[in-house]
């Protein structure tokens, strides 16, 4: 297995994995996101490949705005991570996170952050297993003008 930063040849593999993580996201939106990731310097995606098959991915961004729970800027932000169920518990996510962290460090980041919803306890356990620490819980509100 190896981890590669996504390029145009990985786009279809990435889209297939991403659809499993976010099935409600339309196909054309996944493709538009992929094109943006390939062109933007502050975005990256990493693909885990095993025997020519994409088995996982991690999307990341460099954020310069305030990131909850962080003390520095910029921060590398894990936007999403997914590993095929048959490849979980084998260190794939750990290697994806290491690739994201190296990328962020090369971009001047000293911290990595991520988020998940309070009810997504599986994601919380995965984050903790990957070395993240919970910093705060936030509820967002809105009011229409």
UniProtKB/Swiss-Prot annotation:
Keywords: Acyltransferase, Antibiotic resistance, Transferase. GO terms for molecular function: aminoglycoside 6'-N-acetyltransferase activity; protein homodimerization activity. It is an enzyme of class 2 (transferase). Residues 1-145 form the N-acetyltransferase domain. The keyword Transferase applies. Substrate binds at residues 22, 25, 66, 79, 115, 136. Acetyl-CoA binds at residues 81-83, 89-94, 120. GO terms for biological process: acetyl-CoA metabolic process; response to antibiotic. It catalyses: kanamycin B + acetyl-CoA = N(6')-acetylkanamycin B + CoA + H(+). Its EC number is 2.3.1.82. Catalyzes the transfer of an acetyl group from acetyl-CoA to the 6'-amino group of aminoglycoside molecules conferring resistance to antibiotics containing the purpurosamine ring including amikacin, tobramycin, dibekacin and ribostamycin. Able to acetylate eukaryotic histone proteins. Homodimer. This is Aminoglycoside N(6')-acetyltransferase type 1. It comes from Salmonella enteritidis.
